[in-house]
Amino acid sequence: MGEEEENPNSIDILPELLEEVLLRLPTKSILKCRIVSKQWRSLLESSRFAERHMSLQNSRRRILAAYNCDCGGRRKLLPESRFEGDEEIVYLHCDASRPSMTCQGVICFPEQDWIIVLNPSTSQLRRFPSGLNHNCRFRIGLWKTFSPGNWVMGFGRDKVNGRYKVVRMSFAFWRVRQEEPVVECGVLDVDTGEWRKLSPPPYVVNVGSKSVCVNGSIYWLHIQTVYRILALDLHKEEFHKVPVPPTQITVDTQMVNLEDRLVLAITRVSPEWILEVWGMDTYKEKWSKTYSISLDHRVVSWRRQKRWFTPVAVSKQANLVFYDNKKRLFKYYPVKDEIRCLSLDICVLSPYVENLVPLPLKPSHPHPTPKNSDFEMRISRCRLFSTPGSWISKILKWNVMTLEILFTSLAIVGYICLPL
């Protein structure tokens, strides 16, 4: 009687087998399964599981678009995705006029006083002070110069330790008639919530330049009399120069991460409309032209419009999905040399992959949803999300979730126990 008797009805599942089964569940089901047991929660919240899950999700990347709304409601994914042609579009409820940066399914929103980091897949949100002193003293008085328009921002993930980091370079003129600005550089570690100073870059890049994170480095494109590409290794936290492709760059050139490769999309208007796509081998830092698409009379007319085009995805058949600054989405089929319009009204943000990597919340972090902030959990005026219901509706919702978890658990047990 001193020893506990084993329950003959219990089923022991090997952790390795359980992990393989859970990896193949939809993300929503995975999140709900965390409350089944401590063992399941520990497994599902491990960095190993998150990395393996993201590797599997990379094979079914989708497109993230803004459900453009300035209602002031919380930023979150719409419940259901939609298809434009055969491309799956995931919509984020947000104000598309505000700047944003994405990396592997996590989004960063830089604001005047705060840096907001959001994982739409898990609904985790963190906010951090911008780390800047907005008041700069000049000889002729006190000027407010530190607005987001005076920053060069970057957001990415350290490929060595997996930490997300935010980079900002601010430019200030401390004296009247000062030719070169004073550059202040800093990096925010999302895990610790702390800012650290960086050594200045070898040269200044355009204020407001969009950043791209590829393979653990953030890149910026500088376009003036000469064009340059600046890179920051997020693990070493060191800047370095990157060679440019052997072609002419236009002021409307867009730099993106296309299938884990640094890409420049160049829109040419003379002698005809052409979209050129150049990709760089990250390790050799050598460029090659991967697409040259004629746009005349298919996408644009001969009228000289302010137009540029940005690639967003490549299908398994090497078909290129791209969009323009007029909210139109296209797909190019190289074999047929054909362009199809998938949507006439869409605000594309970036490629999207579901990501279960947690955003740590530590006592030193500010509360993610301060009162009277733009991120307070409240009802959206656009009526996208249901209002908080009565206690009866809450009980029904809880019962539905419990049943989903029960059926998932039974499916796993059946998958493991049924004879082959």
Swiss-Prot record:
InterPro entries: F-box-assoc_dom_typ1 (IPR006527), F-box-assoc_interact_dom (IPR017451), F-box-like_dom_sf (IPR036047), F-box_dom (IPR001810), Kelch-typ_b-propeller (IPR015915), SCF_F-box_component (IPR050796). Pfam families: F-box, FBA_1. LRR repeats lie at residues 112-135, 226-251. It comes from the Eukaryota. SUPFAM superfamilies: F-box domain (SSF81383), Kelch motif (SSF117281). Residues 7-53 form the F-box domain. Disulfide bonds: none annotated. Signal peptide: none annotated. Keywords: Leucine-rich repeat, Repeat. This is F-box/LRR-repeat protein At2g43260. It comes from Arabidopsis thaliana.
